[in-house]
Amino acid sequence: MRLNQLSPSAGSRPDAKRAGRGAGSGLGKTAGRGHKGQHSRSGGFHKVGFEGGQMPLQRRVPKYGFSSQKGLRTAEVRLHEIARVDGDTVDLAALHKAGVVRKNMRYVKVIASGTIDRAVSVRGVKVTQGARKAIEAAGGQVVEEG
């Protein structure tokens, strides 16, 4: 038996209301659509947000703000991922080369997740306080660049 073979037990669910099946059904004649008007007709439809020709709310309210693209180009790197970088210097180019971050990433921040067991020099990359302590405890250094 599979999930798509399950069905509710008989009588546990009410039957669906079938529109336009006689007056006794409660949805006969106009089938719950009322008399005349756009919504009673087949194809009676208007797009979402349409207000009958009145200037819609979405266009009446002014635009404001913007979406910063910096978040799309910022990567977080864990301490144990730094170990994948060859050499003693960890910078943006070295992280790209090692495949730790994608080529389109322009900003990197090292976060204190995992452990680091070798001395590395981190330069040109932002580092959290916890990550800085871990790097320095392993004998490495963090070089701030202007």
Curated annotation (Swiss-Prot):
Coiled coil: none annotated. NCBIfam families: rplO_bact. Binds to the 23S rRNA. It comes from Halorhodospira halophila (strain DSM 244 / SL1). PANTHER family: 50S RIBOSOMAL PROTEIN L15 (PTHR12934), LARGE RIBOSOMAL SUBUNIT PROTEIN UL15M (PTHR12934:SF11). Residues 21-31 have a biased composition (Gly residues). This is Large ribosomal subunit protein uL15. InterPro entries: Ribosomal_uL15 (IPR030878), Ribosomal_uL15/eL18 (IPR021131), Ribosomal_uL15/eL18_sf (IPR036227), Ribosomal_uL15_bac-type (IPR005749), Ribosomal_uL15_CS (IPR001196). The gene is rplO.
